[in-house]
Regions:
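Intrinsically disordered, low-complexity regions enriched in acidic/Ser/Thr/Pro/Gln residues
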Residues: 1-129, 136-137
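Short alpha-helix boundary/capping segments
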Residues: 19, 138-142, 194
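Surface-exposed beta-strand edges and their flanking turn/coil or helix-capping segments
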Residues: 28-32, 42, 70-73, 141, ...
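Short, surface-exposed, charged/polar-biased interaction segments
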Residues: 49, 124-127, 131, 171, ...
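A mid-sequence, solvent-exposed acidic-amphipathic segment
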Residues: 111-169
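Feature captures the catalytic cores and cofactor-binding loops of soluble hydro-lyases/lyases
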Residues: 144-210
């Protein structure tokens, strides 16, 4: 579970997520970023992970009221979001190029980095790349969570995401596309076909789906 608080208000339950219990700090920070709850790390006063309780407790620098409407995203692990809107994100104007011969080597690197995925096929993997090598890789039972971990690690390690390439073993749905738009990635590569909503959204956002 994820709970938030600030110095003036009591603890508030924010969300309950199913997750592979590794890199939970990255998961929480990425989730908060994608949902627009934080803009940068300065918005987090403290973060405590209580693994034995399955709880992450975040102290925010400013008051936050959780939306009453929660949307459960597509996928077998049932991700959660407070918004599915693409409108906040302007089209990505990028001069970055991706050659066809780069795609397969990058996917091979993703598979090599995702050892649990290769061993079990029971989790999803995701990665951020500069076109030649992987900068970050993460695995989770949920494909949405894997992207949250990528975003969280990028923020905590100050690794730029804009203009990079996002890779995933999972299907690119409209919710996954929204996360790519948030990161500013002009290319999203997946081993599975995207949904029709993702294709339409990608046209609006200037994102190439492969």
């Amino acid at each position: 579970g994820l709970a938030s608080r600030n110095s003036a208000l009591p603890t508030t339950a924010m969300a309950t997520m199913m997750s592979t219990p590794v890199k939970l700090d990255y998961l929480v920070v990425g989730f908060l970023s994608f949902e627009g709850i934080i803009q940068d790390l300065a918005d987090i006063t403290s973060l405590e992970i209580h693994e034995e309780m399955g709880l992450a407790e975040v102290t925010l620098a400013r008051p936050f009221t959780p939306p009453t409407r929660r949307v459960f995203t597509s996928g077998c692990s049932g991700g959660i979001t407070f918004s599915l809107a693409l409108q906040p994100y302007p089209p990505i104007l990028s001069e970055e190029l991706l050659r066809p011969e780069q795609v397969y080597p990058l996917m091979r690197q993703l598979f090599e980095a995702c050892t649990l995925y290769m061993a079990t096929r029971g989790v999803h993997g995701a990665a951020l790349s500069d076109g030649e090598k992987l900068l970050i890789a993460a695995e989770d039972v949920g494909r949405h969570n894997a992207l949250d971990k990528i975003m969280g690690e990028a923020l905590l390690k100050e690794i730029p995401t804009r203009g990079r390439i996002l890779l995933s073993t999972g299907r690119i749905s409209s919710e996954m596309l929204r996360k790519g738009a948030h990161m500013g990635t002009p290319f999203i590569i997946s081993r599975t076909s995207p949904t029709s909503l993702a294709i339409e959204g990608a046209k609006q956002l200037g994102i190439t789906l492969i």
